[in-house]
Amino acid sequence: RIWGFVLALFLLGPGLLVNAVLKAYWGRARPTAVTEFGGEANFTPFYQISDQCAKNCSFVSGEGSGSMTLAISALVILEFFRDRLSPATYRAGQGLTLLMLLFVGFQRVAAGGHFLSDVLLAWTFTALIAAVLAKPLLLRDSPPPAPVA
């Protein structure tokens, strides 16, 4: 089930939603391509579909979505092996996962490849897809929550 979740998340997040739909049709130019940073394209806010980019556009960040997918996958796998790990190893795994996620996002913005909103929304969309996939793929055999008294 875990590997099905990981595969589905990679296919639906970075694969389908980000690269096949948003980056292909949103048309938002990358920071290095807009006039404010020496390029020739006009800046457009993240919520506006544009014609300022023809292919491999800025919205949303593929690396941001991929790094969030990797982070969620790592956390799910860590949770699966939690009873076999020491508490320190488990926390270290969580911390390293968070550092990787933040590093990738910061690197994409610092390099001029994406606006901060591109990265934050890629993380958000990917997390939402993971939340939708979790119930049928990860939580289906979980016991129901205890009633609140």
Where are these regions (language model features)?
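Membrane-embedded catalytic cores of phosphoryl/pyrophosphoryl-handling enzymes
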Residues: 43-149
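Membrane-interface interhelical connector segments
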Residues: 27-53
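Interfacial segments of alpha-helical transmembrane regions
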Residues: 1-24, 90, 94
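Short, well-ordered alpha-helical segments in soluble proteins
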Residues: 16, 26-29, 78
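Basic side chains
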Residues: 23, 28-30, 108
